[in-house]
Amino acid sequence: MKKYTFHPQKKPNFGDWQAFIVSRLTIFPHMHYTPYRDLLLKLFPNYLKVRKLPLNGGMTCPNLDGTKGFSGCSYCNNRSFSPVFDQAKVSIQEQLDKFVPRLREKYPNAGILAYLQPYTNTHAPLEHLKGIIDPIIKHEEIAGLAIGTRPDCLEDEKIEYLAEQNKKKPIIVEIGLQTANDLTLAAINRRHTLAEFEDAVKRCQAAGLTVTTHVIVGLPGETMEDFKKTATVVRDLHLAAVKIHPLHIVAGTVMAQDFSAGEIKLLDFEEYCAAVAEMIKIIGTETAIERFSGESPSEMLLAPNWCGERDRIIAKVEELLSRK
C-alpha cells in the first residue's frame, strides 16, 4: 500500500471556544448560526479542513432485525443516503485500505473523519464493536470517528468504551431524533421515545463524548409548533451539532406507498425554509448547523424535487433570518 505523507496545517490558537464564537459573530454579524466547520475546527485544531470518510460497519437496525421490529422506520431506505451501502460485507480494514488513499490523494492536507454511517452502528455486542472501531482509531491517517446510531442502542458499557477511545481521537456520536413529538415517533415507527433520546444524550455527554443529532422537518401531521419544540429540545440538550432536512420520499419505503396513495402532503420550498429559520432562531449559536437539507439519488427520490438544492435553501434561510 502506498504511503501518503500529509502536513496538517496549524491554525491560530483561538483559546476558549465560547470566546471564539463571540468573536466570529462580531466579525461576521450576519451569521445567525454556527456552521459545522466551526465545530470541526474546535475538535480538530490541526486541520484547516476535515473531510468525512463514510464506512460500512456491516451493522443492521433493531427496527429491522426483529429486536424491536421488522418493518423499519417508515421513511427510511439506507441505500438512498449511504454511498458505502454496498460495502457491508467488506471488512473495515479493507475499506480503510481502499478509501483512505483515495481521499488522501484528493485532499492531501485535510483531516479525515471516519463516519460509520449506514444503519445503527452501536447495535452489536461490545466485542464486535471493538473489532469495528479499534482498527479505525488505530489508523494513522484517521483524525477522528463519527458514529451514527439510535438512542436505544447506547448501553453504558458501550458509552464507556467510546469514552476511552475518545481520549485517543475525537469521537462524535450522532444520535437520531427526527422529532420531539412522541406521537409522531410512534407513527413513523421509530420505536423509541423522546425520553430515551434525552437519556442517551445526557449519558454520552457525561462521558465526555461530542453528541450531535439529526431531525426531519415536515413529518406527517406536524406543524410549526412541533418544529419549534424539536428545536427547543436540541437547544436545551446543548447538542454540538444538528442535521436538519426536509421529509423527502424515497422508493422502497412505507411512506413511498402512502405518498403514492395521496396520504402525505409535503412542505413546499417556502414552508420548509420558513420552518428551518424559526428553528435556528431557537437553537441559537451554541449548536452548529451541520446540514440544511438532505438528498437522495435521483433514481430513488420521489419528492420533493428541490431537496438537493442546498445553496438555494441556505440562501433563503439566511434571507429570512436577516429580516427584522
What would you call each of these model-derived segments?
Residues 21, 27-113:
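N-terminal [4Fe-4S]-dependent radical SAM core
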Residues 2-3, 10-12:
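Polybasic, lysine-rich low-complexity intrinsically disordered segments
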Residues 28-51, 241, 248-324:
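Auxiliary Fe-S-binding modules of radical SAM enzymes
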Residues 79-99, 103-126, 141-154, 170-196, ...:
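Core AdoMet radical
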